[in-house]
Amino acid sequence: MIYRENFGSLILPLLLSALVGYLLGSISFAILLTKAFAHEDVRAHGSGNAGATNVLRVAGKKASALTFLLDFCKCVASVLVGYFLVKHACVANGVDPEMARLGMYAAGFCCMIGHMYPLYFGFRGGKGVVTTAAMMLLLDWRVFLICFAVFLLVFLKKRMVSLSSITAAAIYPVVTFCMTYFVDCCVGGLPVLYVVMATLVAALIGATVIIKHRANIKRIRNGTESTISFKKK
């Protein structure tokens, strides 16, 4: 159980977790690798997005695969740093160690924001799909697997990463609620507060990803959105 007088001890590590997450998220591997492989700014080509999909269009499969891997890893690093920073504070101040998950949420979400609005690259980044996927996996692998399955089904049908990402983001809070309430709460005995917190964060993450895809949504409606081809360049 966490007491009011102890909660203040988590504020600083939570803020530090958020800062670390944002700074790590601001490292845009899409921009760095496209410059290294193709000597171009990925944001000046294709969709204008600094993400693995656009890197595939501009710099090829190797650069895209590396971008995907490194974007995933930076979110993993952020979430782990956030978890251990807050867990250390919990142990030192007699707070329930389960509250360390707050550090994961803070660092992971801010890593996603850093990826979208990178400090080092004029606040023009990607749409946060890979970083969001990494955070989903670390926070709840069950929810991740369901959302990823939906992502794959939509992608195999439409060949549009944007539509697949939007669909997965839209169902993310719904799947999170169902899993945390019907499994973790009703069966596992976790408090309703945990369900509320997890669902609210999932809704915030999903909404952020969808908002970042506004231009893609317009192109999908107009039938002009780009599709992915696996033919050799």
Model-derived regions, located:
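Membrane-interface helix termini and inter-helical loops of multi-pass transporters
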Residues: 2-4, 90-94, 181-193
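Short, non-helical or kinked segments that cap or interrupt transmembrane helices
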Residues: 40-52, 120-133, 160-171
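Alpha-helical transmembrane segments in multi-pass membrane proteins
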Residues: 13, 17, 21-26, 30, ...
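Loop-to-transmembrane alpha-helix initiation sites
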Residues: 145, 161-169, 190-202
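Cytosolic, membrane-interface loops and tails of multi-pass inner-membrane proteins
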Residues: 31-64, 125, 218-233
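Interfacial segments of multi-pass membrane proteins
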Residues: 56-60, 82-86, 128-158, 171-180
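C-terminal membrane-associated helical module and adjoining short loops/tails
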Residues: 190-233
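Short, strongly hydrophobic alpha-helical membrane anchors
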Residues: 1-12
